[in-house]
Amino acid sequence: MEIIWIVMIMIGIIMFYVAEIGAYFWHRFGAHTEIIDKVSLNTLKVKQTHDIHHTIIDDEAHADFFYVCFLLFFYLVFLYLLFYYDYLSFSWLLVLYLPVFITLVWNWYVHSAYHQEDHWLSKYEWFKHDKFLHMNHHIDPNCNYGIATHFTDEILDTMSYS
């Protein structure tokens, strides 16, 4: 019985990384290319709304968060169907969903804070550093796709400190 909890914790941690990597690819290829717009027959306009965010510095990209909510909803429906048809226990549903939900909501919250002048997080050095990296992304949209973390930028060589 104890081993299952250890496995669940490990899977939960892995799901955090899966969500961060997914957010990186969504941002890099979903928001900065027209891939999703073309697949959706131009109904979603992800690149268009993200371009607006890049041109108006105090825009907190709430339109982008709509897409995150959309993805989280359909991921939850998928997991719920697995649960409903007894392919997944409720505990596993939580282990697979909560880390992704928390990671993506945290990314959105931190991202919104980057675009607010006197946010309460501004007193922390880590936040100032990450805000600097994010604002570099607005200057050069070909780097620093990470939002709350930048380990994927480091791994995929898209990190820029200048």
Language-model regions, residue ranges each:
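Feature marks short, highly hydrophobic, charge-poor N-terminal signal-anchor/signal peptide-like helices
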Residues: 1-9
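Membrane-embedded catalytic scaffold of the fatty acid hydroxylase/desaturase
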Residues: 16-162
